[in-house]
């Protein structure tokens, strides 16, 4: 077990040698963040664990390590990784299937969409699924949970959600009743009632405000950007408010242009599919105009936009939605909503991750 001080890498926890290698090779982790190390140390005891730490602090890696170690240590034991959204399930499946391949384990994806499901539901070591799909599987097969040694619930704070909460509660209650030996690992953003929820789960609570990157929260009005709060692992003085160049009647365009000039990226949230497409279309036109100005966008950047744009009107995506998305992406802006095809979503998400 890890010492209570000092740095902790994959070799600090007494893991199976092939799992240590998989962590390094697949997850590219040579040293865990402090809250990750504490979570792994507690999770490897086999008891229930609730990990409540900020976004991007590496919660999933903790669950992967604990779940895989349990499967490797207990022959015939299975693991289930539950997420709220199909897109998130596919993202986690890519990571888990890569880890599984290193460990000679079988992984499957179940999201309720036959065209998107991967692997066999009859022969798996690790299943990645949405909460609704797992609820359906449990109801249709009485002994489905009998061999599950570890159940991971990602985005656990959604148990308070009126739509998804009841399904999550039923899944957890059935798992605890039908298979008391099943370890439950709940991954959550920081929440106010973490102690009470952990008590309900009979789980060890690991919570932290530590985050690997600085998070700034602020407001933007009348072309003035004001930072009100900075969350960082080190004390930071609030920066002075600053003005952003642009048209005060088009504040969003000004803020996006300012962000891109700093080599940053932006996510803009709106309340409907139509609004997402409209804003993307207008921002794309604006950025194309801006890119024609000297120094605003490199030829390499424009080439990357065009490359992604071309993918979106390929043989399989030559639809009105594909064309609309392609036109927006040619200006460096995409839109993302439930009306996109799986391939369109994949292309847009991958382009954003790569900083295109």
What label would you give each PLM region?
Residues 1-50, 76-77, 285, 291-330:
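Helicase-associated low-complexity/disordered flanking segments
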Residues 41-49, 60-75, 95-97, 173-175:
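Walker A/P-loop NTP-binding motif
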Residues 45-51, 77-79, 124-125, 182-183, ...:
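Pre-Walker A (Motif I) flank of P-loop NTPase domains
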Residues 76-129, 133-136:
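Conserved nucleic-acid-binding Ia/Ib motif block in the N-terminal RecA-like helicase ATPase lobe
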Residues 81, 93, 97-108, 275-356:
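Conserved C-terminal RecA-like helicase domain
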Residues 119-123, 138-151, 328, 345, ...:
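Short basic/glycine-enriched coil/helix segment immediately N-terminal to the Walker B
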Residues 127, 131-135, 141-184:
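SF2 helicase catalytic motif II
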Residues 173, 181-282, 334:
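Conserved interdomain linker/interface between the two RecA-like ATPase lobes of SF2 helicase motors
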């Amino acid at each position: 077990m890890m010492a209570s001080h000092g740095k902790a890498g994959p070799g600090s926890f007494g893991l199976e040698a092939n799992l240590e290698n998989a962590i390094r090779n697949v997850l590219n982790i040579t040293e865990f963040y402090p809250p990750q190390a504490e979570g792994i140390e507690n999770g490897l005891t086999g008891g229930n664990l609730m990990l409540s730490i900020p976004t991007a602090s590496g919660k999933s890696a903790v669950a992967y390590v604990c779940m895989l170690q349990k499967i490797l240590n207990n022959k015939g034991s299975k693991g289930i990784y539950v997420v709220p959204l199909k897109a998130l399930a596919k993202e986690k499946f890519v990571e888990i299937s890569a880890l599984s391949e290193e460990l000679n384990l079988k992984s499957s994806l179940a999201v309720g969409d036959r065209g998107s499901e991967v692997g066999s539901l009859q022969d798996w070591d690790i299943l990645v699924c949405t909460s609704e799909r797992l609820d359906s599987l449990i109801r249709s097969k009485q002994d489905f949970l009998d061999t599950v040694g570890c159940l991971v619930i990602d985005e656990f704070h959604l148990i308070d959600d009126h739509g998804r909460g009841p399904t999550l509660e039923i899944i957890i209650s059935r798992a605890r009743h039908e298979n008391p030996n099943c370890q439950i690992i709940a991954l959550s953003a920081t929440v106010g009632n973490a102690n009470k929820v952990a008590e309900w789960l009979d789980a060890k609570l690991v919570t932290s405000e530590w985050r690997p990157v600085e998070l700034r929260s602020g407001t933007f009005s009348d072309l003035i950007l004001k930072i009100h709060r900075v969350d960082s692992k080190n004390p930071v003085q609030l920066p002075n408010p600053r003005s952003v160049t642009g048209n005060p009647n088009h504040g969003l365009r000004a803020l996006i242009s300012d962000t891109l000039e700093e080599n940053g990226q932006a996510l803009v949230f709106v309340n409907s599919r139509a609004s997402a497409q409209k804003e993307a279309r207008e921002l794309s036109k604006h950025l194309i105009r801006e890119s024609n100005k000297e120094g605003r966008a490199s030829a390499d950047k424009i080439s990357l936009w065009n490359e992604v744009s071309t993918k979106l009107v390929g043989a399989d995506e030559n639809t009105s939605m594909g064309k609309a998305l392609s036109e927006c992406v040619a200006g460096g802006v995409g839109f993302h909503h439930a009306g996109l095809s799986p391939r369109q979503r994949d292309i847009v998400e991958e382009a954003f991750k790569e900083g295109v």
